[in-house]
Amino acid sequence: MKIRTLSGSVLEPPSAVRATPGTSMLKLEPGGSTIPKIPFIRPSFPGPAELAEDFVQIAQANWYTNFGPNERRFARALRDYLGPHLHVATLANGTLALLAALHVSFGAGTRDRYLLMPSFTFVGVAQAALWTGYRPWFIDIDANTWQPCVHSACAVIERFRDRIAGILLANVFGVGNPQISVWEELAAEWELPIVLDSAAGFGSTYADGERLGGRGACEIFSFHATKPFAVGEGGALVSRDPRLVEHAYKFQNFGLVQTRESIQLGMNGKLSEISAAIGLRQLVGLDRRLASRRKVLECYRTGMADAGVRFQDNANVASLCFASACCTSADHKAAVLGSLRRHAIEARDYYNPPQHRHPYFVTNAELVESTDLAVTADICSRIVSLPVHDHMAPDDVARVVAAVQEAEVRGE
């Protein structure tokens, strides 16, 4: 897609050498050789010269925030990318996008009702519910997809419908839920609003080929520096309903309208001009970068086919912040992580702990309810998260594959 700068020139695909952090080294043994570490996340941003050009234009316009020309163009560009039937509100970060989504979809709560959500997601999801006046009700996940389990939700709704204000559905790891239509039917049957947290999923598609962004009452994205589509700090709320997006814009500006009078509860959630400018540059060539990330997953799947790990369903059409895989057992997971460390490869095990096991929610257990979370506990005990980068070097991919294979062979 073509993106223009404030001066009207067309942005070219970012230079081959993008801004990346320095490389650290690991010494394998005393007196031995060193090898470069493979980082878990490698942010990929426009270079200093490109950022300087954007900042000069912003300084010349003397418009740094408050819905400036870059923000307006960025919102339109996001809509062009996601689909013309959608409407977009940009926000300062993904958390504020989620707060706005909950507020405009469910209204202000008084902490006497609950939002159904998986425990197997980032802890900011439950915190957002509390900030907007709702309590988390944790449901289990599906053993095959690791996405929120419809049957777990039904069991709660059928018994406690009057205590449930809505559904906060996570597209886990930014991967589109293959049962999204079933979830929407469930929400309609019980007259419950449904909001989708697709934080890491900008550029992902559902199994039917539709890009994330247009399901439920709304979906939100995070453009944090760790995401495949990143501006540093930023986010967006996307909906088919223009009125909901209009409310989101008011929410992020203290509820103010053109008369400078506040007509609804709000806060400051506006995206800065420099973040919007970065976003415009990041959109150029995005699909090529995402394709390169999916190629990494394909290599992992092929190379680890006999290593005893299973990758997430539908991840092959996701934007892939990282590659999640389940090991055969907790011991196998420990062996895989140990082998990765020895090979100077950074890895994680998201989402372990799940939300309900974070100390805040353990200490304040009266704030939450929970179904049986047996599958969540099992997946957390076996999951590993492997690095994925834009245009990841083949040698790095091969090193990750070899490390996982070695853990299986050695059976540590």
From Swiss-Prot:
Keywords recorded for this protein, A-Z: Pyridoxal phosphate
GO molecular function, one term: transaminase activity
N6-(pyridoxal phosphate)lysine PTM sites in chain numbering: K227
Superkingdom: Bacteria
Coiled-coil spans in chain: none
Keyword Ribosomal protein listed: no
Single GO BP term: polysaccharide biosynthetic process
Transmembrane segments: none
Classification via SUPFAM superfamilies: PLP-dependent transferases
Pfam families per the UniProt record, alphabetical: DegT_DnrJ_EryC1 (PF01041)
Family: Belongs to the DegT/DnrJ/EryC1 family.
UniProt name for this protein: Protein Mb3436c
Organism: Mycobacterium bovis (strain ATCC BAA-935 / AF2122/97)
Organism classification: Bacteria, Bacillati, Actinomycetota, Actinomycetes, Mycobacteriales
